[in-house]
Amino acid sequence: TVRNVCFSKMIKSKADLNYYLEQDRLALGIKPTLKNKLTHDIWHFQIALRKLEYRKNTGKSVFSKIYAVWLQLKVRKLGRKLGFSIPANVFGPGLSIAHAGIIVINKKCKIGANCRIHVCVNIGGGLSKKGNAPMIGNDCYIGPGAKIYGDITLGDNTAIGANAVVNKSFDGNVTLGGIPAKVISDKGPLDILKKPRTEL
């Protein structure tokens, strides 16, 4: 059993939506200007993704359902432009996508608050019939080229090194690296970066 895993609730209210949007902005290090909202492509994508999550989770009216479809198309269009295939309701608040480039996430994944993710990352379901996907805790760093797959759990405060291939569960507060991945340090990203965490 993997310890130190606590997943954030998904967006269930307008207050949740505003909180997620603000935490994402802070994680990206962006000033809250109209220019940035319109011209910062990654933030633009994340705003659309969070609005889609809100509508999918709360929308019961015909208008909300139609608006959710429009938002889904917008997220898909922006994702194609940036190289992202990121479904709704996967990431907790404080998501920071480092750069435009290929990122593919299975819709069954659950990833906690304060995730920093780089390009050429694939997080998938593996070869099992159930197709269960990884569960990744809070305050995690996913380096460029990392591959994470299967019915596994990674604990809070885990760093995954560049090009690592992770196919089994690990407790938190570690750094993983290699093919297949193994623990290469007993320090996680919070210990290395001293980054303040989002309150859950």
Spans of model-derived segments:
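Terminal amphipathic alpha-helical/low-complexity segments used for targeting or macromolecular assembly
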Residues: 1-82, 190-200
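Generic structural "secondary-structure junction" signal
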Residues: 40, 88, 93, 125, ...
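Short alpha-helix boundary/capping motifs
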Residues: 79, 107, 119, 143, ...
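Left-handed beta-helix
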Residues: 93-94, 98-107, 112-113, 117-119, ...
